[in-house]
């Protein structure tokens, strides 16, 4: 009986150690979610992280963030989605939250052409803050449930993405839960693949950078 108890204790300790190792293997990815006012950024995050939709609009003040754990390409990922306010008066303040980001989502309202043009300004801002290092970035045409295909925008969206170095674009609807999971999972894949390539060529590991990603405000050295 005594030896059986010891065996159970050993098994329990081993299970705890395995769980700890699994937690240690998870990496954190900080994703910026930006775009002009009332494009549905918060609704996209709420739909993705909590699978709910609030039709009543409430603007984000400054910055907020939500988290979701997922597994992609055999890698456990803690995804941190940073909801950046779209109001111009918060522009200078919110840029300090760009530091240590691994990727970005730029959102525009498919029913408002001005927000499509505003997406370029956000991409230019990100490129400037990251010294034109081409941070993995996707473009979301949100509220597509309010339009009838084929969708038309001030510029051809394929050409627009190529010229402004977006990795991909997606048609999304937070209300109808369309395209959001696919978009964010694809962005994570792009990030993981890019760092796998970097790791092979330089020995750099994504986890090295992830450890420096914080959930508290830190002042950016490259963008203000």
Swiss-Prot record:
<keyword id="KW-0342">GTP-binding</keyword>
<feature type="lipid moiety-binding region" description="S-geranylgeranyl cysteine">
    <location>
        <position position="224"/>
    </location>
</feature>
<keyword id="KW-0449">Lipoprotein</keyword>
<feature type="short sequence motif" description="Effector region">
    <location>
        <begin position="57"/>
        <end position="65"/>
    </location>
</feature>
<dbReference type="GO" id="GO:0005802">
    <property type="term" value="C:trans-Golgi network"/>
</dbReference>
<feature type="binding site">
    <location>
        <begin position="83"/>
        <end position="87"/>
    </location>
    <ligand>
        <name>GTP</name>
    </ligand>
</feature>
<dbReference type="GO" id="GO:0032438">
    <property type="term" value="P:melanosome organization"/>
</dbReference>
<comment type="similarity">
    <text>Belongs to the small GTPase superfamily. Rab family.</text>
</comment>
<dbReference type="GO" id="GO:0003924">
    <property type="term" value="F:GTPase activity"/>
</dbReference>
<dbReference type="InterPro" id="IPR001806">
    <property type="entry name" value="Small_GTPase"/>
</dbReference>
<dbReference type="GO" id="GO:0006886">
    <property type="term" value="P:intracellular protein transport"/>
</dbReference>
<keyword id="KW-0636">Prenylation</keyword>
<dbReference type="GO" id="GO:0005739">
    <property type="term" value="C:mitochondrion"/>
</dbReference>
<keyword id="KW-0547">Nucleotide-binding</keyword>
<feature type="binding site">
    <location>
        <begin position="142"/>
        <end position="145"/>
    </location>
    <ligand>
        <name>GTP</name>
    </ligand>
</feature>
<dbReference type="InterPro" id="IPR027417">
    <property type="entry name" value="P-loop_NTPase"/>
</dbReference>
<feature type="binding site">
    <location>
        <begin position="35"/>
        <end position="42"/>
    </location>
    <ligand>
        <name>GTP</name>
    </ligand>
</feature>
<dbReference type="GO" id="GO:0012505">
    <property type="term" value="C:endomembrane system"/>
</dbReference>
<dbReference type="InterPro" id="IPR005225">
    <property type="entry name" value="Small_GTP-bd"/>
</dbReference>
<feature type="lipid moiety-binding region" description="S-geranylgeranyl cysteine">
    <location>
        <position position="223"/>
    </location>
</feature>
<protein>
    <recommendedName>
        <fullName>Ras-related protein Rab-32C</fullName>
    </recommendedName>
</protein>
<dbReference type="Pfam" id="PF00071">
    <property type="entry name" value="Ras"/>
</dbReference>
<dbReference type="GO" id="GO:0005525">
    <property type="term" value="F:GTP binding"/>
</dbReference>
<feature type="region of interest" description="Disordered">
    <location>
        <begin position="203"/>
        <end position="224"/>
    </location>
</feature>
<feature type="compositionally biased region" description="Low complexity">
    <location>
        <begin position="209"/>
        <end position="224"/>
    </location>
</feature>
<feature type="region of interest" description="Disordered">
    <location>
        <begin position="1"/>
        <end position="22"/>
    </location>
</feature>
């Amino acid at each position: 009986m005594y030896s059986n108890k010891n065996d159970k204790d050993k098994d329990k300790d081993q299970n705890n150690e395995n769980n700890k190792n699994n937690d240690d293997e998870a990496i954190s990815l900080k994703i910026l979610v930006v775009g002009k006012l009332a494009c549905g950024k918060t609704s996209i995050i709420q739909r993705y992280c909590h699978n709910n939709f609030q039709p009543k609009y409430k603007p984000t003040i400054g910055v907020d963030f939500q988290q979701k754990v997922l597994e992609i390409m055999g890698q456990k990922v803690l995804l941190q989605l940073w909801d950046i306010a779209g109001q111009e008066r918060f522009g200078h303040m919110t840029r300090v939250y760009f530091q240590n980001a691994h990727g970005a989502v730029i959102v525009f309202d498919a029913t408002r052409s001005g927000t499509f043009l505003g997406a370029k300004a956000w991409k230019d801002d990100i490129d400037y803050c990251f010294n034109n290092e081409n941070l993995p970035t996707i473009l979301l045409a949100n509220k597509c449930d309010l339009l009838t295909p084929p969708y038309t925008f001030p510029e051809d969206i394929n050409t627009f993405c190529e010229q402004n170095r977006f990795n991909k674009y997606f048609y999304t609807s937070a209300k109808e839960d369309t395209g959001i999971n696919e978009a964010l999972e694809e962005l994570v894949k792009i990030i993981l693949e890019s760092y796998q390539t970097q790791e092979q060529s330089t020995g750099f590991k994504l986890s090295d950078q992830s450890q420096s990603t914080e959930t508290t405000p830190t002042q950016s050295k490259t963008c203000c």
